[in-house]
């Protein structure tokens, strides 16, 4: 999948450095010699920084934040400064957002401090979850499971088999799964 990711910001910075690999010294087993690995593509750690007015655009998600970092070693986008992430019809906000990816697809989103998730059911109706921390897990680009920790609250609109709204569930707990 050659889906392109676009990132804009006032300042962009990219750093590449070779991974370090350890070699044991056969003459002295108490010594560990660390030498730089040759700078081949798979052995290079790439770190990317975006500062001020950062925007991300991809076919399956968009995001805005003040700044972000990304490291190829763990494939996590770390967004800071009032980050907002949109994926499909779901909006995620928190003080900090960690977006985990694998093979260019979102696998997990971690919302740290003041986490809030809103999912549009139809015009003017949103299922909502909030808490101190929220972890969302994705399958095939769609959010499938959400775990809320510390001061968890949710509002969920129930629908019958004909998609007619049949009620609203409001919950509060220490955690919601």
Put a short name on every predicted segment.
Residues 1-177:
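Structural signature for solvent-exposed beta-strand/loop edge elements and short helix-capping sites
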